[in-house]
Amino acid sequence: TDEFADFYNALQLVTPLVVAMAANSPTLFGHRLWQETRIPLFKQSIDCRPNDTLHPIPARVNFGNNWVREGAFELFAEAVLLYRPILPNCSDEDALAVLRNGGTPQLHELRLHQGSIWLWNRPVFDPVDGGHLRIELRAFPAGPSIVDMLANAALAIGLAKLLQPTIRELLPAIPFTYCTANFYRAAQKGMDAELFWPSLNQSQPEYLAVPQILESLIPKIPEQLLGMGFIEADFMPLIQVIEERLQTRQNGAQWQLQKLAELRQDMPKREALVSMLQQYQRNSAANIPVAQWL
C-alpha cells in the first residue's frame, strides 16, 4: 500500500542518522576501522558474487535498489526476480486456493528465500495470527546497553513517522544513490558524518552534520510517538538518552576509541583492548546509557 511505501521510504531516509548516532563497533581484530564496522564486515563476508564489473549482479546484503513506489509487494518481487534461491523449499501449499477460501497462505518458499537476502531494512511476511507484515531494523547495533538499543528504536520509529507525511515531496530532492551513500558514510564516520539532507527549499545538494540535522528533528518526535499509541512515560526517558548522547557526542564507538587511547598510554594494545572490553561489559550489565560512561 501507499502507506507502507511512505513509511518504508521515510525509514530508509532516516536510517543513516540512527546508524551514526548508534555506531558501536570501531575496531576489528585490534585494528581501528569504521565507526560501525559490522556493516561493511557483514556485506563483504556474505558477498560471493563473481568479480565482473561489466555485468554486475545485485548484492544479497543491500541497502536497497530504489525508493519504494507502491508497497511491500515490489520488495518481495525484487527478491524473487533478482536473486537465485540458495535453499530450495517446495511445499505442497496452493497459496491462491488458501487465499480464495479465506485462509492465510504460509508462503514457505518466499519466506525462506527472503531470509537469504539481507536488506538492512528488511520486509518480512509472517502468517501468524492471520498474517502480518513487519520491517526488521537490521542496521542498528546491539548495545552498548539495553536502554541505548531501546532509544535507537524510538529514534528510528519517531523520525520515520515524522517524515512519512511529506516523504513524497522530499524524495525528488534526494536520489536514492545519495541515501545509500549517506548510509555507508554514517557507518564509516559515525556522529562526525556529514550527510546529504533533502530540503524543499534547496537548489543544489547540501551536506549537513548529523547533530545539526537531529537537533531540529528530535523535539518533534514525542508527538509522533504519542500519536502511534506509545506511552509518554515509556518513551520520554529514551528520547532523553538520545538527547544526552547528542550533547556529549559520545556513542559506543566514540567511547571505545577514547577509552582505548587512554589505556594505551599505560599498557600494550592487547591489554588495553581487554581492559576496555571488561569496562564495557560492566557498564552494559548495569544498563547505563553510553553517554554517561566514563
Residue spans of the language-model regions?
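Acidic, glycine-enriched catalytic cores built around paired aspartates
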Residues: 104-117, 123-132, 140-154, 158-294
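Loop-rich catalytic cores of soluble enzymes, especially ATP-dependent carboxylate-amine ligases
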Residues: 1-134, 138-141, 170-174
